[in-house]
């Protein structure tokens, strides 16, 4: 899906939090390999932040989930190394995005907003420090989703 002239999944590597990969906390259910079925949409390495080690999981289509237990900076360093000249995308969830915003490691924020109220959950832009979001281009989307892109100014 093009956003700002680029595909969401065109990054050379992705980073996500544990909850974006798997439900539950604690030790892993090794039968669980993500929400996406046999062929996730990433088609690149995905670094999953976690406190619980797990062997990497290789899926169809070029997606490999690599589990990182030593923090956001370590995950970013590994992702940058494999991405080369391509972008590294933070795939979420909100707490992971907030950690990277607070650390000053996000340059551009792409939000895909669906008109669904889910109830309680993590708040985006919570405890991220003093940042300004500059809109890049006009919002796009459909009645089911709005795509918004911002430059992060520190």
Language-model segments: residues:
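Enzymes that bind and transform nitrogen-containing heteroaromatic metabolites
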Residues: 1-154
